[in-house]
Amino acid sequence: MSDSKEPRAQPLGLLEEEELITSSMNFFPRDFGFRQTRGYKSLAGCLGHAPLVLPLLFFTLFTGLLVAILVQVSKNPSSQRLDQSKQDEISQDLSQLKAAVERLCRPCPWEWTFFQGNCYFISNSQRNWHDSITACQEVGAQLVVIKSAEEQNFLQLQSSRSNRFAWMGLSDLNQEDMWQWVDDSPLSTSFKQYWNRGEPNNIGEEDCVEFNGNGWNDDKCSAAKFWICKKSAASCSRDEGQLLSSASASPIAHAA
């Protein structure tokens, strides 16, 4: 073990302390406001109490940060009230728009499809042919009667897309092989091309007609199938069109 003792640090003299402070001042930016030629003695006193200065500095910064947070929090209720007021205003506009839309004249009811001045509805449930007629009558419509090749192509496409075999308003219940629509009009000769190959075959008293695949098929009227209703589209007045324009413009103006 060595008997030598570590040298103890000698306290700085006044001149040495001033030189140390003066040389240290070169590390401070000028923006801090410190000058080497003035006030270095007071700075020496502050540095001499560094353990007290740093906590004081941190406390000041923390206090300032806390005050800033409190100010921001105090502003939140006001901004929330403004946001709520804006939301209430938009909600009121939407309610007015909804009421206006409900009063508007629509060519077809919801879930109905418009085509060439008529409205069509493909059911989601199944009934026999006679009950399908009743179902259409209950909504002011008729089990579909086809009047043109364009209408036939449209309905055949709708039936195929929905993958549903659906009743139409055609049967030979009154007289075998005398096909007649529910409005008592006879089947046009030009429409016979729409029968599927080998149809109508009248196997087992098949007297009612359905959309089946890419054409028509006769089946038992007691079979449960989907059905297609048809009714004339409503005509809308000019004023109702203007109502829609004014109602739809209202929320846009407020939301801008």
Swiss-Prot record:
Keywords: Adaptive immunity, Calcium, Disulfide bond, Endocytosis, Immunity, Innate immunity, Lectin, Mannose-binding, Membrane, Metal-binding, Receptor, Signal-anchor, Transmembrane, Transmembrane helix
Topology class, membrane: Single-pass type II membrane protein
Domain C-type lectin, residue spans: 114-230
SUPFAM superfamilies, per the entry: C-type lectin-like
A GO molecular function held by the record: pattern recognition receptor activity
SMART domains reported in the protein's UniProt record: CLECT
One annotated Gene Ontology cellular component of this protein: external side of plasma membrane
Membrane-spanning residues: 51-71
Domain of life: Eukaryota
Extracellular topological intervals: 72-240
Stretches assigned to the Cytoplasmic side: 1-50
Localization: Membrane
Expression (tissue specificity): Predominantly expressed in liver and axillary lymph nodes. At very low levels also found in other tissues.
Residues bound to Ca(2+): E199, N201, I203, E206, N217, D218
CDD domains listed in its UniProt record: CLECT_DC-SIGN_like (cd03590)
Signal peptide residue numbers: none
Motif stretch (Endocytosis signal): 14-15
Keyword Iron-sulfur applies: no
GO biological process terms held by the UniProt record: adaptive immune response; endocytosis; immune response; innate immune response
Paired cysteines (S-S): C108-C119, C136-C229, C208-C221
Leftover remarks: In vitro, is a weak receptor for HIV-1 and SIV and poorly transmits HIV-1 to permissive T-cells relative to CD209.
PANTHER family: CD209 ANTIGEN-LIKE PROTEIN C-LIKE, KILLER CELL LECTIN-LIKE RECEPTOR SUBFAMILY F MEMBER 2
Function of the molecule: Probable pathogen-recognition receptor involved in peripheral immune surveillance in liver. May mediate the endocytosis of pathogens which are subsequently degraded in lysosomal compartments. Probably recognizes in a calcium-dependent manner high mannose N-linked oligosaccharides in a variety of pathogen antigens. Is a receptor for ICAM3, probably by binding to mannose-like carbohydrates.
Name of the featured protein: CD209 antigen-like protein 2
Organism for this UniProt entry: Macaca mulatta
Gene transcribed to yield this protein: CD209L2
